[in-house]
């Protein structure tokens, strides 16, 4: 049995600023600034490591100090970065956000253009690693072209997290190739045109997805295959 999982997706640095008192716009506010490793792909890889899985992480790092910080984090977690891509002069993916004094987000800025460097050409050089994996997990930060290429060329079971409503559209060309898909209800509704959770799941299965885990916030998860549907609170 294959002993590792490949994760293809984003790693980014989350920078959070939180004021110590009521936020005043257009002024300098005293508070705290924290830096935290993030990114959907990186978080999936982290969770897999916590479960004891061996992980090969295929992602893109820029040529800045953020890249080294994130590389060190991934290595400390035990991820294999042997297939990761370095982009000289590139900006490592960064998410900057400001909250109010209660921690509620007021403004966010996302600089994730480097994910476009994860191209079919780059992945084709690592196709043996991808197809030799027990599973391949991808996120919606990849371009639609890259996702479609993975759907056409990856023979390992393909798992996908769409990330957001807008980025979920990028999954459309590869839906028929997905083994497991984990959208939330809004993402699923926008992809299928269905309104009910049951309708969303049925439509995704009809398009070729083998397993769907539809998250519904406080209403739990609807898990389904073509033969069985289970509601998990």
Question: Across the structure, where does each feature detected by a protein language model lie?
Answer:
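A glycine-rich helix N-cap at a beta->alpha junction
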Residues: 73-89
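Structural detector of well-ordered beta-strand residues that form the stable sheet scaffold
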Residues: 6, 56, 137, 158-161, ...
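Conserved phosphate-binding/catalytic region of the ribokinase-like
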Residues: 1-6, 29, 168, 197-233
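Short, acidic/turn-prone active-site loops that include or flank metal/cofactor-
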Residues: 12, 32-35, 111-114, 162-166, ...
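Conserved phosphate-binding/catalytic loop of the ribokinase/pfkB sugar-kinase fold
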Residues: 86-87, 97-135, 140
